[in-house]
Amino acid sequence: MLNVGYDCGTQFILIYWSIIYVEKLGFNLSLVYTLFMCALILGSVLFNKISTSLNSKGITLLNTGSMIGAFVLSGTLKNKYLLLFLFLLIELLMGMMSGQISATSNEAIYGESNKSTMLSTVSFIAEILVSVSLFISNSIMEIFGDLKVMFFVSAVYFGVVLLIIPLIKEKQDVR
């Protein structure tokens, strides 16, 4: 579930920021894409470094809280350089989250004999849900007529997917 939610969120950011919002701000798409990839990779490396000293739950809470804050700020600010900085911060956090989700997925399927089938199924479901979520995102944007509303939608989305769902699952696992 976490993997699917992350994939849907990543596609939203990739499509709406990298293509539509970049055009409105006047940045070069190649430059932004390169910075985006560097931030994503740096986030993954950073996760590998800090995961040895901090617990997974603490990293998730800090990361998700920071991401929600960056989304909300992105929806309220107008300075294009601050928006670019926030975008790169979001991508750095997404890179950290990617490493964390990979680690969590590996823990979840450790010892399973049909790992490839499980991963393929999750990937297939993720692609379908990504398509559905992009359709919903498009509809929301058409209703409100402003891209900035999508940053608030993203903040709520990531709050639900990365905080509420894992906390509910954790409570169920305790029982």
Region annotations inferred by a language model:
Residues 1, 30, 61, 116-120:
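Conserved glycine-rich helix-kink/hinge and helix-boundary motifs of the Major Facilitator Superfamily
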Residues 4, 34, 38, 120-128:
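Transmembrane alpha-helical cores of Major Facilitator Superfamily
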